[in-house]
Amino acid sequence: ITGIGIIAPNGKNKRQFWDNCIKGLSFIEEEPEMRSIGLKSSVLCRIKNFNLKDHVKENEYLGLIELDNFVQYGVVAGEQAIKDACLDPLNLNYAKKTGIIFSSAIGGTPTIVKIFDELTSNGKTDIQHKKIGERFYNSGMFNYPAMLLAEKYGFCGPCSSVSTGCTAGLDALGIAYK
């Protein structure tokens, strides 16, 4: 493991994340809506005050602003990891051996649910066949952030996405270590 990037409720980079963990700060908040949809829990942690333009250049990833937040978070965390690893984007000698292990607990599920609700009148009708936009597929694919980064930097090593719920980040570290 040579580089780590993090976008999380308790930090938008490795240092901020770790400092907030050490301080024991909680970013849990009540969300009554969770109970109304049948969940036993009513708490969650949100990533707040994230602005993609603060992290990537405007033309660096075309269309990224239109994709699900998880894709944006993944690309920004990936860029952080590449910087953390001190990889020189102009030196492609390492590209054949460099891989990406990416993780997300739920990926683009919010976008998938939103589109499903739109196509079924919130689950009350059969799916209506109509255009949903060209960005839908990429917003829902767990591997899309890793693919964007591998393509941009020419990485040819393993490119994998892990989606194992709350342990996805730890699982990605374990897989990368192996």
Which residue stretches match the model-derived regions?
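Short conserved active-site loop signatures built around small residues
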Residues: G169
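Short, hydrophobic/aromatic alpha-helical segments in well-folded domains
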Residues: A172-A176
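Short catalytic-loop micro-motif centered on adjacent basic/acidic residues
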Residues: C159-S163
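Conserved "HGTGT" condensation-loop signature of ketosynthase/thiolase-family condensing enzymes
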Residues: I1-P158, K178
